[in-house]
A protein has these predicted regions:
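Extreme N-terminal tail/first-helix region
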Residues: 1-21, 158
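Acidic/His metal-coordination segments adjacent to aromatic residues that form catalytic metal sites
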Residues: 4-7, 45, 83-97, 129-137
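Short amphipathic alpha-helical segments
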Residues: 16-23, 46, 60
Length: 163
């Protein structure tokens, strides 16, 4: 259990460091760079940040609810995340608002991860009839998901600057 808690403390610290670093680098980017889509099927930087806000809000519910119950049945939005981004119109939102919401939501998640009740780490989210994920795995994987999308944003910004 001690190893898992140390791992999660490291995850929380990395989330905070990544968020602060990215927010500092991206705060002053112009809208034409932020709305650039490398192809018609790709998201812009604004849309990726919007998706990460959706991810944070869904994971916030999971992280808290899984400390209240041993097994959680909660919908997975993954199959609909393109629609989530479209419905919320992230492409046309003010950048300062998106970046701020993303930053603060992740600071909140890092704090939840850091202070999780160790006795709840094996509580499970029931994805479907056959698949479950523990709270520990959800929290640890959140960092990987964040890193993947920050890499996506880095590539999108490079393409926008080369365009």
């Amino acid at each position: 259990m001690h190893q898992k808690m140390n791992k999660l403390k490291s995850v929380a610290q990395k989330i905070e460091q990544m968020i602060e670093s990215a927010a500092d680098r991206w705060r002053a980017l112009p809208d034409n760079i932020l709305t650039f889509r490398p192809s018609e099927n790709d998201w812009s930087t604004k849309e990726v940040i919007g998706h990460l806000i959706d991810s944070a809000s869904n994971n916030h519910q999971r992280f808290v609810r899984l400390q209240l119950t041993q097994q959680l049945i909660f919908p997975d939005y993954g199959q609909d995340n393109i629609r989530w981004v479209s419905i919320q119109n992230y492409q046309n939102r003010r950048w300062e608002e998106l970046l701020g919401l993303w930053r603060y939501y992740n600071i909140q998640l890092a704090d939840i991860i850091r202070s999780v009740d160790p006795s709840c780490l094996n509580h499970v989210w029931q994805l479907d009839a056959n698949d479950t994920v523990t709270l520990f795995d959800l929290m640890a994987d959140y960092l990987r998901h964040l890193e993947d999308h920050l890499d996506q944003i880095t590539a999108t910004l490079a393409a926008a600057n080369a365009h």
